[in-house]
Structures are given as structure tokens and as C-alpha cells.
Amino acid sequence: MARLDVYRNPDGNGFLLDVQADLMSHLKSRLVIPLVRSDIAPLPIKVLNPVFELEDALYMLLTQQMAAVSIRMLKSPVHNVNDRRDEVVAAIDLLLQGI
């Protein structure tokens, strides 16, 4: 498991983005943010909800729904968004720090 790996959401609704530091990989949980199809997602908030193209569809990062899940929920990664790291960090910073 690596930071910014994307996993299929086991509930069948989009994906989960792993945002936990690799240094904490020994823990039995991972901090994730849901990625939900843009056409069913709430109205986006600039910076907080960047949009990603995955498998020919647009998915919104619902940073405000960040949560910890058991590593058992995360199977094999299907994507990695390391190239969008700065946007993900900015979204988390906005949620946690207000900046």
C-alpha cells in the first residue's frame, strides 16, 4: 500500500484514495478519501474537491468525507494519483487548517 494509491470502494461506489503517510504502513488501518462520480457528487467546493479522470469518467474527491478504514477493505490498487499530490494535499490542508 502506498500513499495516493486508488482502490475500488468495496461498497461499489467509486474509489478510495489512500492519503496516509507510507511511514505509518505498519498500522492496520489507512486514512482514505472517497472518489465519487462527479455526476452524483454534491456541488464541489473549490480546492476541497478536485476532480480526477479515472477509467474514462470524472470522479470528485470528497475530502470532507475522509475516514480511516481497515486495510482488509483495500485490495489491489487500480490507479495512483501521485502526479496530483499537491492538489490532494491542498484539499486536506483546507479541510484541516482552513488554508
For each predicted feature, which ranges?
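Compact nucleic-acid interaction/catalytic patches
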Residues: 3-6, 10, 15-48
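Absolute protein N-terminus
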Residues: 1-3, 99
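Residues at structural and domain junctions
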Residues: 2, 18, 74-78
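Short conserved beta-strand and strand-loop elements enriched in small hydrophobics
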Residues: 50-53
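C-terminal terminal-subdomain/extension
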Residues: 55-99
